[in-house]
Amino acid sequence: MSPVRPRFYTPREVSRHCIVSDLWVSYLGRVYDLSPLLELHKGDVLLKPIIEAAGRDISHWFNPKTGDVKTHIDPQTGCLKYYTPQGRFLHTAPSFPCSGWDNDFGRPWWKESTYQIGILSSKTKFIRIINTLTSQEQALEVCSEETIREILGRYLPYNGHAGSYTWKFCGLPLDMDKTLQENGVWDEDEEFEELKIASDLYTPSIHLYFNDDLTEL
């Protein structure tokens, strides 16, 4: 049995989850739902920096090589300590020895894989999906790593019968298990940037042709 493919998220999707009861963050290329953590430690003042960062990327908190919180030499004590200019947060030690510091919490939250829900896309793009049967058009932000089948999943809220259509680009059927790039839908953003042309002036269009089999997903 092949492993389950992780889901990809756009920064915009992460940013929508920005309240205490529904709090996501991203760091080091992964997306995390920290809502259970906040519920578990409800009322703890050390949650404040995490709550303030809700819906955002906090990769700058961490050392990309170790995956741990960044460290520095404390100028007052000369000791190595966590670098937390945003304020000390949950599971980081206090600056000075403290009898009330309980480090018997096991794995720190930033290394707890159970909070991970997916991968942050390295590049997103807007496409237009045009239903040739109804002439309806939908703009959709997608992840460059997603296959057409996964993009279909994003489109389902707008068309519950999306699986009953043949998906085409420039008149050619798309391979549903390949990405846009692998299907020849090239990302020209870099070329547009070199030419100083706004990338949103061109949005690739995917055309859907009804198969008349009433497939329901």
From Swiss-Prot:
Give the matching Pfam families: Cyt-b5 (PF00173)
Q: Boundaries of each Cytochrome b5 heme-binding domain copy?
A: 6-72
**What do the Gene Ontology cellular component annotations say?**
cell projection; cytoplasm; cytoskeleton
Spell out the molecular function terms from Gene Ontology.
Answer: metal ion binding
Check the record and name the PROSITE patterns matching this protein.
Answer: CYTOCHROME_B5_2
Q: Where does heme bind?
A: H41, H72
Question: From what superkingdom does this record's organism come?
Answer: Eukaryota
Going by the UniProt record, its keywords in alphabetical order are: Cell projection, Cytoplasm, Cytoskeleton, Heme, Iron, Metal-binding
Chief location of this protein within or outside the cell:
cytoplasm
* Family (UniProt): Belongs to the cytochrome b5 family.
Q: What is this protein called?
A: Cytochrome b5 domain-containing protein 1
What organism is listed for this UniProt entry?
Xenopus tropicalis (Western clawed frog)
Q: Tell me the name of the encoding gene.
A: cyb5d1
